[in-house]
A protein has these predicted regions:
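N-terminal cap/leader regions of alpha/beta-hydrolase-fold enzymes
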Residues: 1-237
Length: 237
């Protein structure tokens, strides 16, 4: 059975925040930061940590809304979840959240369960953009970005991304246009250790099984197969 515990992460400015940690049954492995959607540190995001642990990774999901409300985790299944989530996102200091995610990455590397201090990052929705920003501003060993709507406007940072990176998008995404997806693809075209996938019929947040408006089971399964293969090749256990 995987081991689950809460981690306490201290930022450079002294702010302390929680993280949900899942250690694989083997007891050790490379690390992966899991960055939340706009709904916060939800059961879905905790489930992603469990999925990564099943692949052999030590997964840590930091509570990046902690500077607003340390306990917030919205239920995507409730009708008021979307407006509440957009309200939280509008209050979020994104550059600070990127710094906090990088602090979580540094913290993860210090844990005894993380082999050789190796750690990467994966993010979904809001977290897809944050994962990209951390890849540009910090030093993860790998980055996986699911439908990060903030990425197209920040492609000037693409040259600062030096780790292997995987992008997953849906072609029916209401928040990321075909032109924006193509711009991301072009920014990374021809670079080694980079993958770009677009899933037919899939909306934003297609991986989230608790978000019935968006979930696309077939696309989610394909994307996770691609993610697993990418990590196995570029960031092996």
């Amino acid at each position: 059975m995987p081991q689950i515990r809460e981690e306490r992460i201290r930022a450079a400015d002294g702010h302390e925040f929680a993280g949900h940690l899942v250690v694989p049954e083997s007891g050790s492995g490379p690390g992966m930061i899991v960055v939340q959607e706009i709904f916060g540190l939800t059961d879905y995001i905790k489930g992603v940590c469990t999925r990564l642990s099943e692949l052999g990774y030590v997964a840590l999901a930091p509570a990046l809304y902690s500077r607003i409300d340390p306990d917030v985790a919205l239920d995507e299944r409730q009708p008021d979840a979307m407006p509440l989530a957009f309200g939280m996102m509008q209050r979020l200091d994104v550059p600070q959240a990127v710094r906090d995610a990088a602090e979580a990455l540094a913290h993860l590397r210090t844990l005894p369960e993380v082999r050789d201090g190796r750690a990467g990052i994966i993010g979904f929705c809001l977290g897809g953009g944050i994962a990209y920003f951390v890849a540009a501003d910090s030093d993860p060993d790998v980055a996986v970005c699911y439908y990060g709507s903030a990425i197209p406007a920040e492609l000037g940072r693409a040259g600062k991304v030096h780790c292997p990176v995987l992008f997953e998008f849906g072609d029916a995404d209401e928040y990321i246009s075909a032109e924006q997806r193509e711009a991301v693809k072009q920014a990374f075209e021809g670079r080694p250790h980079t993958e770009f996938h677009v899933h037919s019929g899939a909306n934003h947040a297609f991986d989230n099984h608790n978000a019935s408006l968006f979930h696309h089971p077939e696309a989610a399964a394909r994307a996770w197969e691609e993610t697993s293969a990418f990590l196995s090749r570029e960031f092996p256990v």
